[in-house]
From Swiss-Prot:
Pathway of action: Nucleotide-sugar biosynthesis; CMP-3-deoxy-D-manno-octulosonate biosynthesis; CMP-3-deoxy-D-manno-octulosonate from 3-deoxy-D-manno-octulosonate and CTP: step 1/1; Bacterial outer membrane biogenesis; lipopolysaccharide biosynthesis
Full protein name: 3-deoxy-manno-octulosonate cytidylyltransferase
InterPro entries: Cytidylyl_trans, KdsB, Nucleotide-diphossugar_trans
One Gene Ontology cellular component: cytosol
Family to which this protein belongs: Belongs to the KdsB family.
Disulfide bonds: none
Organism: Coxiella burnetii (strain CbuK_Q154)
Primary subcellular site in the record, as a coarse category: cytoplasm
Catalytic activity: 3-deoxy-alpha-D-manno-oct-2-ulosonate + CTP = CMP-3-deoxy-beta-D-manno-octulosonate + diphosphate
GO MF terms held by the record: 3-deoxy-manno-octulosonate cytidylyltransferase activity
Primary enzyme class: transferase
Gene behind the chain: kdsB
Pfam families in UniProt: CTP_transf_3 (PF02348)
């Protein structure tokens, strides 16, 4: 099975401008993401950006770069433009790996592509990992996902879902029981789906939560979630996250 990885990267991040180029262990963060994608065994890895600074840095460490519009509201929109520009076929599998996920395991990238290949009835495959810390559950920067019994996504939110009506009032003594999952910012989809996604209007929930994947659920699409077997540390959204990732390396 062949798949390609596109890494959407922008400089003007709302919460942490310039984070794609922040130094982590002697390399820009985007390079760590790129190297994980290369190790996954992808047929091709491309960085899609609208910023000349990111392009220059990426080309300096040997990456293929596709320049895109600065008008995109999400990584999926940026990837859709890049896939067309690169001439990818509708049935090809693309993994969208966010540029702020420097600790993503390469095997998780491949597993996601394989999962989509095995499920013809879904629009998208994505990744989640069990939440084991109470602070992470209540962290608004952490996106949570609720699954059904077959691991299809029911809803995504920055809020701590599902809400424990009888237990969440006592956070200090809260014991998590394995029913909460953090969404990891990586998706697999076929190129042909991207055109369909762009034809859909953004839904109210997507606008409220600022989560692009809610558009898929709103319009009746199915997202199959792979529960990661190896640890997937959170991505980078804050200065504290940068220090955490630096300590990891």
């Amino acid at each position: 099975m062949e798949f390609r990885v596109i890494i959407p990267a922008r400089f003007d991040s709302t919460r942490l401008p310039g984070k794609a180029l922040v130094d982590i262990a002697g390399k820009p963060m985007i390079q760590h993401v790129y190297e994980s994608a290369i190790k996954s065994g992808a047929e091709e890895v491309v960085i899609a950006t609208d910023d000349k600074r990111i392009r220059q840095v990426a080309e300096d460490f040997g990456a293929v770069v596709c320049m895109t519009s600065s008008d995109h509201q999400s990584g999926t929109e940026r990837i859709a433009e890049a896939a067309v520009a690169l001439g990818f076929e509708d049935d090809e599998i693309i993994v969208c790996l966010q540029g702020d996920e420097p600790l993503i395991p390469p095997d998780a990238i491949r597993k996601l592509a394989e999962d989509l290949d095995e499920h013809d009835n879904v629009k998208v495959a994505s990744l989640c990992t069990p939440i084991t810390e109470v602070d992470e559950l209540f962290n608004p920067h952490s996106t949570k996902v609720v699954l059904n019994r077959r691991n299809y996504a029911l809803y995504f939110s920055h809020a701590p879902i599902p809400w424990g009506r009888d237990t969440f009032s006592d956070k200090e003594n809260l014991q998590l029981n394995g029913s909460h999952y953090r969404h990891v910012g990586i998706y697999a989809y076929r190129v042909g789906f991207l055109e369909e996604y762009l034809s859909w209007d953004a839904c109210p929930a997507e606008k409220m939560e600022a989560l692009e994947q809610l558009r898929i659920l709103w319009h009746g699409g199915r997202i199959h979630m792979v529960v990661a077997k190896s640890k997937c540390p959170p991505g980078v959204d804050t200065e504290e996250d940068i220090e955490r990732v630096r300590a990891y390396f």
